[in-house]
Design a protein with these regions (language model features):
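Alpha-helical secondary-structure segments
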Residues: 1-72, 83-90, 115-127, 252, ...
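Generic hydrophobic alpha-helical scaffold/packing signal
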Residues: 9, 96, 136, 140, ...
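Short, solvent-exposed loop/turn and secondary-structure capping segments
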Residues: 19-24, 29-33, 131-136, 193-198, ...
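Short, solvent-exposed loop/beta-turn-alpha elements that line the ligand-binding surface or hinge
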Residues: 37-93, 112, 173-174, 199-258, ...
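Compact beta-rich and alpha/beta scaffold cores in large eukaryotic transport/transcription complexes
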Residues: 162, 279, 292-294, 309-310
Length: 352
């Protein structure tokens, strides 16, 4: 049930998770992180655009009225940027409401027998590590809090248990065949060309880790205005167009290359941006994937040298690279400098 998966998503306190397990990372609520550049001519990141921010807000059940964004509890959160910056992905009361709704749907469809709901979390290994057990315990604690917060009939309990696969090959075979309830994965690539991400990672049956989602995507409709005309097609076909599909056999029903009269590489960036944002939203709203965090690399810096930029530009430029590094001290000068501070530069770094 998508409602049950949605309840799981709102149950997870992502800040608590990354503080414990991924301290250099950040809360992630989208399918593309901050590194994806939608316009290489200007270096503009997809995640920084209004369209991409609206996608995440809508996936989190926010809505806009007269320029002000409101959360699911009808509480004003301010402008688009203010509302976006306030997102955490965690909402205990909303998760409880969704869990109650999922329970009613499960009972109505005859798929709940009154017993505890146990979700199998699958991974590779010969045993459950201390870190993995801590992760399972944390998530189970969050799920227990949601069940306790329900004031209407709901599931007896919801929890995770671990199932181990002995090797990577067996694990990935089972994943692609849909033989597991839950897995934890990360993927990406082509940061300067994000258009094919939705199709290749989430829809294409040959490559996707979402078992059977290609057929689901064919039933999700998206309408986008192109040159003053509304064009309706499935998520599958819009994602295929972004993947540069041109022949009929690459589409399900609507050959958007012919309908639009333009390939993705020739289309205006603003239009491609709108298509990507709408596809990401449609995929997020299936709750087949529950984004948790954006993974980042953290490095220590030294007062011995300066990068070309104090700020990370993008994944192609970084902080300017080796050619733009300049040294403030030679090795000998640096050694003397450190010794002059008795080996403790805390006050120096704090002041700077």
């Amino acid at each position: 049930l998508s409602t049950f998966r949605k309840a799981l998503s709102f149950s997870i306190n992502r800040q608590s998770y990354i503080t414990r397990f991924e301290p250099t990372s950040d809360i992630g609520l989208g399918l593309l992180n901050d590194l994806y550049i939608y316009n290489p001519d200007t270096g503009e990141a997809y995640r920084d655009t209004d369209a991409a921010k609206e996608t995440i807000l809508k996936a989190q059940d926010y809505y806009e009225k007269d320029g002000v964004w409101y959360n699911v509890h009808d509480e004003a959160q301010g402008s688009l940027d203010d509302a976006y910056d306030s997102l955490t992905g965690f909402d205990l009361s909303h998760a409880a409401d969704l869990m109650e709704q999922a329970y009613q749907e499960a009972v109505h469809e005859g798929i709940y027998d009154g017993e505890p709901v146990v979700i199998t979390y699958c991974t590779v290994g010969s045993g459950v590590s201390e870190n993995l057990q801590a992760l399972i315990d944390m998530i189970n604690g969050m799920l227990a809090d949601v069940i306790a917060a329900c004031d209407q009939p709901t599931f007896k309990s919801v929890s995770l248990k671990v199932q181990l696969y002995a090797d990577e090959a067996t694990y990935w075979e089972a994943l692609k065949a849909g033989k597991m309830d839950l897995s934890f994965s990360t993927w990406g690539g082509s940061a300067m060309d994000p258009w094919g991400i939705i199709y290749s990672c989430y829809i294409d049956s040959a490559n996707s880790n979402n078992f059977g989602f290609d057929s689901v995507a064919k039933g999700i409709g998206i309408t986008i205005n192109y040159n003053g005309k509304d064009v309706a097609a499935s998520l599958y076909d819009w994602a295929a167009w972004l993947y540069n599909a041109q022949s009929d056999n690459q589409y399900d029903k609507t050959n958007l290359y012919e309908v639009l009269g333009v390939a993705v590489g020739e289309a205006e960036y603003d239009f491609k941006l709108e298509v990507l944002a709408q596809c990401e939203l449609a995929q997020l709203q299936t709750y087949s994937n529950l984004p948790i965090f954006y993974s980042y690399i953290t490095s220590l810096r030294s007062a011995q040298y300066n990068n070309g930029s104090d700020y990370y530009v993008n994944n192609m430029i970084g902080y300017g690279g080796i050619r733009h590094i300049y040294y403030n001290y030679s090795d000998a000068q640096w050694s003397n400098f450190v010794q002059g501070h008795n080996g403790n530069l805390e006050s120096y770094y704090t002041a700077s």
